[in-house]
């Protein structure tokens, strides 16, 4: 029997939604390698990079898809990427960088890459786009999102419903547009939910797309 899916916005009360955030982090790691799981030993660092900033800084701009109260999809995002990035650097990135440099994640190549990117010794995918493109994204499409759906629940409309709810709330705030970065595989899905390609570059031999939606 098909399970009923509900879409819920996470509250700003961290204690209330702590189990939800744990489930979001778990799903992030189970889908973090192009939809497939990442190695178990990388889970803690991976969630600190990709989930913690949203949990700490803007939990109210994150959403979950629930089936029988189980998290089967999530969307993390914010309405103002430039402001979010400044706060994230101070509150999340710098403390994590200190721990990486001091050896907390010794042996994790992902930790080394995070440190190199934070110190601007290596560009993150989004910083590899030409400066005019990055400026256009922040000016015309200031919101951004990340999203993952459990493999069992893909192609069932869960992703579209998460995005629709996020966009509805952005429009209430009169945000002008939203962007995201992704590889080649999700492009057809995002095209189906009205995003279009603004630019594409190659990063370490793989295409990275900047997808945008004007609100």
Question: Which residue ranges define each predicted feature?
Answer:
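Conserved N-terminal entry element of GNAT/NAT acetyltransferase domains
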Residues: 1-19
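Glycine-rich phosphate/pyrophosphate-binding loop shared by adenosine-nucleotide-utilizing enzymes
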Residues: 5, 69-74
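Conserved GNAT-fold acetyl-CoA-binding loop/helix
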Residues: 18, 32-50, 91-101, 105-106
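Active-site rim helix/loop that mediates acceptor-substrate recognition in acyltransferases
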Residues: 39-62, 68, 76
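Conserved acyl-donor/pantetheine-binding loop and adjacent beta-alpha core of acyl/acetyltransferases
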Residues: 81-146
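Conserved GNAT acetyl-CoA-binding A-motif
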Residues: 141-143, 147, 170-183
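Conserved acetyl-CoA-binding loop-helix of GNAT-fold acetyltransferases
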Residues: 146, 155-169, 192
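C-terminal "cap" of GNAT-fold acetyltransferases
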Residues: 176-187, 197-215
């Amino acid at each position: 029997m098909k399970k009923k899916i509900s879409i819920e916005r996470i509250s700003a009360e961290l204690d209330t939604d702590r189990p939800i955030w744990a489930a979001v982090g778990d799903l992030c790691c189970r889908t973090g390698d192009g939809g497939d799981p990442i190695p178990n030993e990388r889970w803690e660092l991976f969630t600190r990079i990709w989930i913690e900033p949203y949990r700490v800084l803007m939990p109210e701009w994150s959403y979950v898809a629930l089936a029988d109260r189980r998290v089967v999809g999530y969307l993390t995002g914010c309405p103002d990427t430039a402001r979010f990035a400044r706060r994230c650097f101070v509150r999340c990135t710098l403390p994590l960088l200190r721990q990486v440099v001091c050896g907390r994640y010794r042996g994790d190549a992902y930790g080394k890459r995070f440190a190199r990117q934070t110190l601007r010794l290596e560009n993150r995918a989004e910083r590899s786009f030409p400066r005019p493109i990055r400026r256009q994204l922040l000016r015309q499409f200031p919101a951004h999102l990340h999203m993952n759906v459990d493999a069992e629940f893909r192609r069932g409309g869960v992703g579209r419903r998460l995005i629709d709810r996020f966009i509805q709330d952005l429009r209430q705030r009169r945000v002008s547009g939203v962007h995201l970065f992704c590889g080649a595989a999700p492009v057809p899905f995002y095209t189906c939910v009205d995003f279009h390609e603004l630019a594409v570059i190659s990063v370490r031999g793989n295409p990275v797309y900047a997808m945008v939606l004007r609100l």
